[in-house]
Amino acid sequence: MTLALNPIAFSIGDIHVRWYGIIIACGILLATFMSIREGQRRQIMSDDFIDLLLWGVPIGFIGARIYYVIFEWGYFSQHPDEIIAIWNGGIAIYGGLIAGAIVLLVFCYRRFLPPFLVLDIVAPGVMAAQVLGRWGNFMNQEAHGAKCSLQYLQNLHLPQFIIDQMYINGSYYKPTFLYESFFNLIGLIIILSLRHKKHLFKQGEVFMLYLAWYSVVRFFVEGMRTDSLYIFGVIRVSQALSLLLLIAVVILFVYRRVKVKPKWYLEGSGLKYPYER
């Protein structure tokens, strides 16, 4: 007999606080802390990252919801009252990343900050939040793969609590949440190990490495998931977007190295710190 973990952390009256929300909040705080710490080294003030957080997080969630609704329009067109019911689930990371990137670019333009440098600074924190955030999916028993045997999970040498949590409605499922979290953790370690090496990254290239790594990981993990969003009924949206992003990163990297010749990442913003508005 298996015993699944309770997705509800605690309740206050009729209000239920889920582990998913707590884990996502911890991921946001971790990303903010990492960005502020690295930003100070690159002559970007902490106030800027706090302000970016206040704009980026809510708009990012809206973008994640809009993305999900668009690709599930067949359902939501019949249930328009559920479009805003985000508490019932249904957000997509790529939608949040796209919305967040737009907010960041506009923010940098308004604050006269170098956008590629800011993207470099926040990328590792975002990746850390993604590593952590997938465990929210674990608590909800979602974002899993196809059915599998108990022996399959045991052969992965997983802790028993993970095996138990992958037992859903009478069947075991592949823990694709864990695959994505693990390989993103590897990518995060690589980025954090390399980003401070001299004459390795131009500004914008830490972000590009993050985007390329995540695109490859997501492409393969998405192929194993059972809850993918589709276009034309046959193409997995996240796989298509991952491939497009990977191609775009390669083109942008070559173009900027050959034509633009940006500053080195370690040179920072060049702003006198702390600077005045």
UniProtKB/Swiss-Prot annotation:
Keywords: Cell membrane, Membrane, Transferase, Transmembrane, Transmembrane helix. The keyword ATP-binding does not apply. It is an enzyme of class 2 (transferase). It is a multi-pass membrane protein. It is found in: Cell membrane. GO terms for biological process: lipoprotein biosynthetic process. Catalyzes the transfer of the diacylglyceryl group from phosphatidylglycerol to the sulfhydryl group of the N-terminal cysteine of a prolipoprotein, the first step in the formation of mature lipoproteins. Belongs to the Lgt family. This is Phosphatidylglycerol--prolipoprotein diacylglyceryl transferase.
